[in-house]
Each structure stands twice: as structure tokens, then as C-alpha cells.
């Protein structure tokens, strides 16, 4: 919405065919390059592109995320390890686009493909997630986050519909009906980092340009991740977009 709004309000001059707009996220410090379809220098809203969980169709907006690593904590792996044991549960704490805590759904006694409504009704589950999130935040150097919405939390499991991995994304005290793009970036990156909770589920290796498809309650979300060859040594700049 930011890109089309900026053009419509005259903040940005539209180009012929398409317009690239650079956006800075004040929440994480990351840079997002949005490509807006602008035939005849006008924003095009109509189209046949669909986003799972979003009603209707429209013109696609391509988002390229940059400077994603360590925006909040200053580290790719805020605990300095691909996994950490918190309250007896193995978790991965990662700061890519959004600081997150990830765990295997089976360690919480669920399959991982439950609906968001079912998970939101499971008060015991939500309480356990919040307890681990608060403890993880301390280990991530984020302090007391009891009144904050980050880090986010995700429960991961094997894909069931042709994707790479299944995620249930918590924002943080309720399960998202679909999935946040920032959280998708973080989970997709975790799939490509050796020994994380995510990579133990997917068992894939980074090739440099990887498509990660995340299954969420209402469909799929695709992430294209460009990495350097230093991905397994946790180089701070390994994620380029």
C-alpha cells in the first residue's frame, strides 16, 4: 500500500510501465524495494494476481527485501547458536527481517496444520508459547518484552501441500490467519541455515538462489532468498534480498 499511496499523493513520480520505490521499515531498519505496475505512468490496480488469504485479485507488487539481518538485535543468531533449549524445548532464535523464535510444532503436542481458530482456542498452548517467547527474548538481548509484539513466534512442521515447510505464525499472542511477509523472510532464511529447527525439518542446502514456499492456514507464500556461500558460517551479510 505504501508504494501506490506515495505515487497517488505525488511523493514519487511514476515511471512508464513500472516504478521502483525504496521503502525503509522504521521497525526493523530493513530496506524494501517495491516494484509497482504503472502503465502510462498511472498506478494499475486491476489484475489477476492472487494472494492466499486475501480476497479478490489485483495487480502484483514485487517486494525485494534488503539489509534484513540483525535489524533489531544486531545479530543473525541473537543467541549465537542455531538452536537453544528453553523450558525444555529446542528453539531457533533468528533476526532476519523480523526477530523470531521458532520451534517444532510436535514439541508443543500439535501436528502443525491446525487452523488459526483452533490454535487460538488452545489457551494452554498460547501460555506455553508466551512463556518461551519471554525467556527467549532475554537470551536474545531484547530484555523484557511482555508488553511488546516482538520477537514473533512460529511453530513449524513438515509441508502437506507441496510447499517447503508449514508454519503457524503468532503475532505474538494469537495465531495469524495467514502469514506475515517479514516472518516469511525469517523462516525462509532459517530453512537455509544449518542445524536450525527449520532446516532440520526441510533438510535442504542453500544454492545461492532458493525458492522457499511456506504453507500457512489459508494457502502458500513464496520467498526467493539470495545467499552467499558463507551461509553455514552465519555471515552477517549472507542474505542479500
Where are these regions (language model features)?
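Active-site proximal loop and beta-alpha junction motif in alpha/beta enzyme cores
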Residues: 1-241
Amino acid at each position: 500500500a505504501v508504494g501506490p499511496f506515495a505515487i497517488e499523493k505525488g511523493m514519487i513520480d511514476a515511471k512508464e510501465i513500472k516504478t521502483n520505490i525504496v521503502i525503509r521499515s522504521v521497525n526493523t531498519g530493513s530496506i524494501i524495494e517495491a516494484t509497482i505496475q504503472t502503465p502510462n505512468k498511472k498506478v494499475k490496480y486491476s489484475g489477476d494476481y492472487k494472494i492466499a488469504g486475501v480476497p479478490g485479485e489485483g495487480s502484483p507488487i514485487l517486494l525485494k527485501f534488503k539489509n534484513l539481518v540483525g535489524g533489531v538485535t544486531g545479530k543473525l543468531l541473537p543467541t549465537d547458536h542455531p538452536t537453544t533449549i528453553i523450558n525444555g524445548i529446542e528453539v531457533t532464535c533468528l533476526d532476519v527481517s523480523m526477530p523470531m523464535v521458532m520451534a517444532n510444532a510436535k514439541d508443543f503436542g500439535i501436528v502443525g496444520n491446525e487452523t488459526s481458530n483452533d490454535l487460538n482456542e488452545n489457551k494452554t498452548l498460547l501460555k506455553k508459547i508466551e512463556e518461551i517467547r519471554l525467556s527467549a527474548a532475554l537470551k536474545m538481548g531484547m530484555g523484557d518484552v511482555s508488553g511488546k509484539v516482538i520477537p514473533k513466534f512460529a511453530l513449524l512442521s513438515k509441508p502437506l501441500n507441496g510447499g517447503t515447510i508449514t508454519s503457524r505464525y503468532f503475532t505474538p499472542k494469537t495465531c495469524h490467519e495467514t502469514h506475515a511477509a517479514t516472518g516469511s523472510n525469517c523462516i525462509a532464511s532459517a530453512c537455509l541455515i544449518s542445524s536450525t529447527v527449520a532446516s532440520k525439518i526441510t533438510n535442504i542446502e542453500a544454492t545461492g538462489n532458493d525458492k522457499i514456499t511456506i504453507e500457512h492456514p489459508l494457502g502458500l507464500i513464496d520467498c526467493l532468498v539470495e545467499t552467499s556461500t558463507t551461509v553455514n558460517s552465519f555471515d552477517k551479510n549472507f542474505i542479500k534480498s
